[in-house]
Amino acid sequence: MEWFEALILGLIQGLTEYLPVSSSGHLAIGSALFGIEGEENLAFTIVVHVATVFSTLVILWKEIDWIFRGLFKFEMNSETRYVINILISMIPIGIVGVFFKDEVEAIFGSGLLIVGCMLLLTAALLSFSYYAKPRQKENISMKDAFIIGLAQACAVLPGLSRSGSTIATGLLLGDNKAKLAQFSFLMVIPPILGEALLDGMKMIKGEAIAGDIPTLSLIVGFIAAFVSGCLACKWMINIVKKGKLIYFAIYCAIVGVVTIVVSQLQ
């Protein structure tokens, strides 16, 4: 992987991790364009995912600081309930990761057709949430957290946007837009770090291929993903507040159709 390829893929990861257009789907498309095999860029994937975690920590640091300050009061307060909701939201993705990891990895290797189909599904979900007008709720309940977690678990499929699925689901449930966007970005931190840790351990044990990627490419990819992630995270929170997700539905529909056509021509 050349440094300019790492730059482009890092930018793609940083932007699409937060924008509701599927980071996994766009990385699959970008890797296919550059001729990069999925098994050969595991180290790069870990690096750019960790970079987006740092982006979240930077942009949402005030919220994270608020959570920890309240959590260490060791009492049942709003901060503790927030953490409980995040833990509840992790249950579905944890089950998928433990029991269905091999099946998910097999789907990732199935080509661009599944990516295109899932992008169309993302477009449909975003459109539905845009036109639906449920009554707004002030706080995210435990039940809502679990349902949003189910949406996150489904979004392990390449092309089905994680942020799009979780935010659209929360909007359909009537959750507060600003709080929903923040919750969506915070709830993904533990799963990303957990997956990165497991993949890193596999590389150390020799159970997975790290890929012969130059250090410069890893550094460039990390910086690109971090910077673009910071911009996208802040931008996306404002987009959700203003209710402008329909534009991303149109984008996903167009890219989905093009991806399906290209997959059939290969």
UniProtKB/Swiss-Prot annotation:
Compartments where located: Cell inner membrane
EC number: 3.6.1.27
Example of a GO MF term: undecaprenyl-diphosphatase activity
Domain of life: Bacteria
Membrane-protein topology: Multi-pass membrane protein
Keyword annotations from UniProtKB, A to Z: Antibiotic resistance, Cell inner membrane, Cell membrane, Cell shape, Cell wall biogenesis/degradation, Hydrolase, Membrane, Peptidoglycan synthesis, Transmembrane, Transmembrane helix
Listed InterPro entries: UppP (IPR003824)
Residues spanning the membrane: 41-61, 82-102, 106-126, 140-160, 180-200, 213-233, 245-265
Misc note: Bacitracin is thought to be involved in the inhibition of peptidoglycan synthesis by sequestering undecaprenyl diphosphate, thereby reducing the pool of lipid carrier available.
Name of the protein in its database record: Undecaprenyl-diphosphatase
Protein source organism: Bacteroides fragilis (strain ATCC 25285 / DSM 2151 / CCUG 4856 / JCM 11019 / LMG 10263 / NCTC 9343 / Onslow / VPI 2553 / EN-2)
Organism lineage: Bacteria, Pseudomonadati, Bacteroidota, Bacteroidia, Bacteroidales
